[in-house]
């Protein structure tokens, strides 16, 4: 079968695609691959900023060019990563090899490309990419729509402030109330729930195979890798 709205396995991608389409940029496989590329690129840049001794020669002017790899990430790029994965049988390793190809295209980066993914395990990439996708989906799609809903309900509550209506208790007619007040109840509830959601920390896992930066410490014991990891996650990804 050809994939369309009727043949999709999940109703999220089928029946309700019109409602969920905006989330494809955050939760599709294409999006996950793109976020993995972003994390790998930002990690490499952060190593250069440290800098590691072997990365002192990297021109800072190339950083924005490197960022354009994920900013301009295309379906063709994702397709290339899937081609590499068909050989590696490893999705994150395929991202690393793709980035090495992109470094080759830039020229002058051949001596540095082995530091892509230096000291990391796959879950360092997955457990930063996925919360980053959740963070950006909330900030760019979910929060704005909920805030728009709250604003519209508030408008109705003010417009209908003096419209009387019969209230009920236990399903039975009771004392009167006002329509605007009842709508305002939902404004209040939504505002509290939105504030609670925004207060939830979006956390990442980052620290090597077992969370101890073992490979990092063996290679470069003079650096504070725990501080490096915390700074990378907080400043470059906006996570905790």
Can you name each region flagged by the protein language model?
Residues 1-216, 220-234:
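A helix-coil-helix interface module used to build multimeric assemblies
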Residues 236-240:
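Short, intrinsically disordered, charge-balanced linker/junction segments flanking boundaries
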């Amino acid at each position: 079968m050809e994939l369309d709205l009727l043949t999709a396995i999940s109703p999220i991608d089928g029946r309700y695609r019109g409602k969920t389409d905006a989330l494809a940029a955050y939760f599709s496989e294409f999006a996950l691959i793109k976020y993995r590329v972003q994390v790998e690129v930002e990690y490499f840049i952060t190593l250069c900023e440290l800098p590691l001794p072997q990365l002192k020669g990297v021109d800072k002017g190339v950083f924005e060019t490197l960022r354009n790899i994920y900013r301009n990430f295309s379906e063709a790029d994702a397709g290339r990563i899937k081609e590499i994965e068909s050989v590696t049988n490893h999705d994150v390793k395929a991202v690393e090899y793709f980035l090495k190809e992109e470094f080759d295209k830039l020229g002058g980066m051949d001596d540095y490309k082995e530091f892509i993914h230096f000291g990391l395990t796959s879950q360092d990439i997955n457990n930063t990419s996925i919360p980053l996708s959740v963070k950006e989906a909330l900030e760019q799609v979910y929060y704005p729509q909920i805030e728009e809903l709250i604003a519209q309900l508030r408008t109705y509550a003010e417009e209908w402030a003096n419209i009387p209506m019969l209230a009920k208790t236990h399903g039975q007619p009771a004392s009167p109330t006002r329509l605007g007040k009842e709508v305002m109840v939902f404004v209040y509830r939504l505002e509290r729930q939105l504030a609670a959601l925004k207060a939830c920390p979006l956390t990442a896992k980052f620290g090597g195979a077992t969370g101890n930066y073992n490979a990092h410490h063996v290679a470069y014991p003079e650096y504070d890798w725990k501080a490096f990891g915390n700074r990378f996650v907080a400043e470059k990804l906006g996570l905790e």
